[in-house]
Design a protein with these regions (language model features):
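Active-site beta3 strand of CheY-like receiver
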Residues: 46-52
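Two-component/phosphorelay signaling modules centered on CheY-like receiver
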Residues: 13-31
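Conserved Asp/Asn-Gly motif in the active-site loop of CheY-like receiver
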Residues: 33-37
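C-terminal output helix
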Residues: 107-116
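Active-site residues of response regulator receiver
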Residues: 54, 83
Length: 128
């Protein structure tokens, strides 16, 4: 099993707790922040192998934050969209914007750890 440092950018405390629990139970090191204000200072403190980012957040949304990441020294980070947007075309929009994968919320707690492993392996996870 691949054990990794994962950064979660998620404004919902309940979702953050769930994601953190599922990933730490699999042995991953997890850092969680509630939004973009802390993103670059957190990245400077330790580069994660993977970023899981909510798309709809107060302040800057996930698309804006991703654009900032892609224009920075962290441009090569793997960033996976975490979103409740599950309508036709939403996944394509996220991938076109530069996300490396797309996981819908609410997540399937049985599949989520495997989706993260796929992302760590360089694959593009999809679905919920």
């Amino acid at each position: 099993m691949t054990v990794a440092h994962i950064l979660i950018v998620e404004d919902s405390p309940d979702n953050m707790k769930l994601f953190r629990t599922l990933l730490t139970l699999k042995g991953h090191s997890v850092t969680g922040i509630p939004g973009g204000e802390e993103l670059f200072s957190t990245l400077a403190g330790g580069r994660p192998e993977l970023v899981l980012m909510d798309i709809q957040m107060p302040g800057k949304d996930g698309f804006e934050l991703l654009a900032e990441i892609r224009a920075s020294e962290y441009a090569d980070l793997r960033v996976i969209a975490l979103t409740a947007h599950a309508m036709s075309g939403d996944r394509e929009k996220a991938i076109a914007a530069g996300f490396d994968g797309y996981i819908t919320k609410p997540i399937d707690i049985r599949l989520f750890p495997e989706q993260v492993l796929s992302a760590l392996a360089g694959e593009a996870p999809q679905g919920g």
